Amino acid sequence: MPTATLKIFLVFGDPKRLRTAELSNWTGKAVAGPRSEFEKVLEREETLNPGVYFLTGIDPDTNKSAIYIGEAESIGDRIKSHLSKDFWNNVAFFISKDENLTKAHIRYIEGRLIEIAKSADRSVVMNSQGSGASSVKRKRKP
């Protein structure tokens, strides 16, 4: 495996608070933070971009780890709509720094992530509907 540099920026100097991460030679960027700093997360310009996001916490019915996986053309607008869901206490999302993700890309990524999360069976997957993976097929080389 080739070497890489992972750059983590601690917005407030605390790894448990708002942070961003970038990997060398990768066009993606990750942003994560606790629900208690939701307003600070929304102030980030990255929330205006399309991407995939994760809401994590504890399922109140089973008391087990829970995750909701979603996609949006505007991360900030979409995650605001999840404020009524009580289970989550952390948010993380991934965007493309070169703005090269289309709706089809993020729907496919969301779908694959949901499939992987369900098959791993390490958390309760809180998504109630199917994913976009089945509607976007991978092209296979002949």
Predicted regions mapped to residue ranges:
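Structure-specific nucleic-acid interaction/processing domains
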Residues: 49-50, 75-142
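GIY-YIG nuclease catalytic motif and its immediate N-terminal context
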Residues: 1-69, 73-81, 100, 104, ...
